[in-house]
């Protein structure tokens, strides 16, 4: 019998006390933005250390700014490495975007979809990996405009993965959000992703501003079309580790576990279907 698929949850400070008592068995790993935890001390710091000593953690960064025209903040990367070494965390992902340029921009901005940007990002990926002594996994991001685009989002993303020879954190919700906002076929985009490059998945909720505009919020339950896209993702690319993101409007843990268990159910069905095809 095959082991079940892995499902994780983004850790928030509000969860620390409860999870230090007992982490629900449905949660296989936790993910944190290192920027929010690197300088944490006191009670929260002790609770966090307790959890990292007992459970599997991934890091998902916010401030690397891999696509910025400004030089990489190498001291920041070294602090990330020290944090990951301290807590024995192996997985580090970041957004394929930038958040600095003539100062910090306080948002994740899309990188121009150009050949020059592909090569620029690839060089910086290797710089980061050399310091971290770990792979850098890049995430497809939601975006609302594509300035100076010379290629499609799909062409840009796959070109970066190939040029940098790196893995992909595939955000299923971002595919759906972008497909509505930029009017493309979400399923076709999903199927075009290189299976061998996908490291793990993100799934989250979004806000419907209008029929033509969705906002990637991570502040609500997962929507039905995103569940359907996740189901298609497992069928197309296999059952991959999947993380539920919920950044605000945090419900009770029991409610989050309902979604986590639903992810497990989709994974189990996909595994069963694969086993039937093999048999």
UniProtKB/Swiss-Prot annotation:
Signal peptide: none
Pfam families assigned to the protein according to its UniProt record, in alphabetical order: MbnB_TglH_ChrH (PF05114)
Disulfide bonds listed in the record: none
Assigned protein family: Belongs to the UPF0276 family.
The protein, known as: UPF0276 protein SO_2008
Organism the protein comes from: Shewanella oneidensis (strain ATCC 700550 / JCM 31522 / CIP 106686 / LMG 19005 / NCIMB 14063 / MR-1)
